[in-house]
Amino acid sequence: MTFLTQVLNGLQLGSIYALVALGYTMVYGIILLLNFAHGDIIMVGAYISWIVMSQLGLSPILAVLLSVAGCTLLGVLIDKVAYAPLRNAPRLSILITAIGVSYFLENGAQLVFGADAKVVPSFIDSSAIEVANLQLSPTALLTIAVTAVSTAILTFLVQRTKLGKAMRAVSEDMGAARLMGINVNTTISFTFAMGSALAGIGAVLYSMAYSQATPTMGVMLGTKAFVAAVLGGIGSIPGAVIGGLLVGFAEVFVSAIGLSVWKDAVVFLLLIIVLIVKPTGILGRTMSEKV
């Protein structure tokens, strides 16, 4: 493969990681929660796509809409059932709950669908397009475009809308935001909805690229997306995108030089190096806390 082809592959994989990392960074930025069930929400979205297209024989467009809607509703439900009752509990309690929700979703999917991988039909024609002797994958181009548009919309919502201002107020000081008349629980639920919707989009793009759904597919995908969020500076939207692209490029280029068995190790090594040099991540900011 040519260098430019590898760059395109890195952009495609990095875009998927970036979308998932955005979900992590949104939730952490509001309530300082590492939602370890986030990767499993992607798994649910992939299974929804498989059911709609393979089992029901419906259109890919409907599969996309139902996957995003299903992930959004699941994210809000998880917040209401598992996290909202622990809003004032110690942070460790919520973290353990998040891990429990993750295991529940994984084992529930295995119980319902079995451990074998389900083949998700391709959404679009995957035949490569040749431009100036460069093989361009329609799936890769669509993935990059969707991620760019999703990031732009998310940035606009957070920076320019009333609800986005409420989200930023809650992230700065939840108590003060409540005193100013902001409905904190509604704001947090909306944050989960947005993060989970991004996970649904990520599920669709991942299914397009790899054409399969398994109960544990969200584990490594979610872990690497979390690494991407931390690399870029968790809580930062541009940081999540930069981190996702770094992880994607690292994986692709390590595989390209024949060291694919080391690609996961290189990703985590990259995280260690960045945190040693800049513990807050590339675009993260240092925060002081009075005790």
Regions found by a protein language model. Give the residues of each.
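Transmembrane helix-bundle core of multi-pass membrane transporters
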Residues: 85-160, 187, 211, 253, ...
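Alpha-helical transmembrane segments within multi-pass membrane transporters and channels
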Residues: 24, 57-101, 108, 242-247, ...
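Residues that define the loop-to-transmembrane-helix transition and helix capping
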Residues: 37, 61-62, 92-93, 162, ...
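Membrane-interfacial amphipathic/re-entrant helices at transmembrane-helix boundaries
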Residues: 1-20, 48, 56-63, 89-94, ...
